[in-house]
């Protein structure tokens, strides 16, 4: 589905601000880049209604994000942060994790997986598996009460994690939510060319993490655990894909979605016209971002069969046979 187009003039300043803030094209010092991202997360994720609690997962830092009000503690979202596998953290991800928690009334766990180039593949995937197993083994969540989410590289990691769980006979989550996922580290999609001069973040230059990934290391970039595009999506839980029409990563979403359709899997794909990479970080500043967050909340309500009353309370709804037969949530 295509969703409305906000004028380029209205978005131009915001796009340039985000581009400069993240240092995506300027290729700054890596450690300074990581530190500046944490500062952004601390600033933009500052909210009185959100509580951030540090968590240790067998030596791996993580952050538990929850709202300071009554919420649904039986459900949890496992969020894989973005950053090209070489930057990003749970603090940087607060812009998204705080909104996930506030908009869904669910707890969110974001973990600090090891970063490249210090730790190439399979470090991030190993840490994602560890975080998922920790939720089940230590926090005693049932797998069907977990949704795996991710943005950008974290979106690709979320899909790779579900592949790994399926391939190793582990219980699968209730659903997957990915924003602008990086699913093809070979950069083979047509949108890498067609949107090259349109993407306000990654376009116009090859001097950025998309074209110089240090995560691959000595591995095959077509390994599905690195580039989920090249894997199988059989037996996947329902997936929500959100992507902007201007992204060089557009085909990373569309090509994966087509593979999911061929398996008769349940999915929803929304292309937000005129939007840039992980535009959801704009929160309520632009209408497309507001609509995307509303879609996220609705998707999770469908996944968990929840009806939300006007006063904010939730009730569990029983699926009918007709509803169980629907392909698309």
Where are these regions (language model features)?
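N-terminal membrane-anchoring alpha-helices
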Residues: 1-9
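An N-terminal hydrophobic leader/cap segment in hydrolases
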Residues: 8-54
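Alpha/beta-hydrolase superfamily serine-hydrolase fold, recognizing
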Residues: 17-24, 45, 51-329
